[in-house]
Design a protein with these regions (language model features):
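Flexible helix-coil linker/hinge segments at domain or subdomain boundaries
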Residues: 70-77, 145-156
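Internal, well-ordered domain-core segments that constitute the primary functional module
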Residues: 92-153
Length: 156
């Protein structure tokens, strides 16, 4: 049984100026939030098996798609293929406005593009315990290419 089935959304926040949901928390599962360019971020709880993560991400996407009721399109791309370079800031949070001003002062680093156009999967592989940390680090180094292969250009 999925964690989503045992969970009720217990916190929903939205930006009143845009009416966008900015944070949804599912107990024991993780957070679903919107990034400055409208990207969706899922910060999951830790999982022992990849299949459990995939199952819960799939169910989370279904919840988002149902909530969007056909009003939004979800793309599975690392970069927005249709946005113009001057893509407006979707979420008018103060921190994103501060970041925009900073990145615009250093256009050579393309920070505004990163904030508004890009999306990625960030996989965290944790080391449990200090006694065998060297073996754990070596295992993580072996798993990095596999992890990249699993998530490159993936819906997950």
């Amino acid at each position: 049984m999925s964690d989503f089935e045992n969970s009720t959304p217990i916190k929903i926040k939205y930006d009143e100026s845009s009416s966008l949901i900015t944070d949804v928390f599912f107990k024991h599962v993780g957070n679903i939030s919107a990034e400055p360019g409208g990207q969706i971020e899922f910060s999951s709880a830790p999982y022992e098996r990849l299949s459990d993560l995939v199952e819960n991400v799939t169910k989370g996407l279904k919840i988002l798609e149902e909530a969007a009721a056909g009003e939004l399109v979800f793309l599975s791309h690392g970069i927005n293929p249709i946005a113009k370079e001057n893509h407006p800031l979707v979420l008018p949070k103060e921190r994103y406005q501060i970041m925009t001003r900073y990145f615009e002062s250093a256009p050579h680093i393309r920070g505004v593009d990163m904030m508004r156009h890009s999306a990625t999967v960030q996989a965290n592989l944790d080391i449990f315990g200090d006694e065998n940390w060297q073996d754990a680090v070596n295992l993580i180094l072996v798993l990095v290419p596999l992890t990249q292969g699993l998530f490159a250009n993936s819906r997950f």
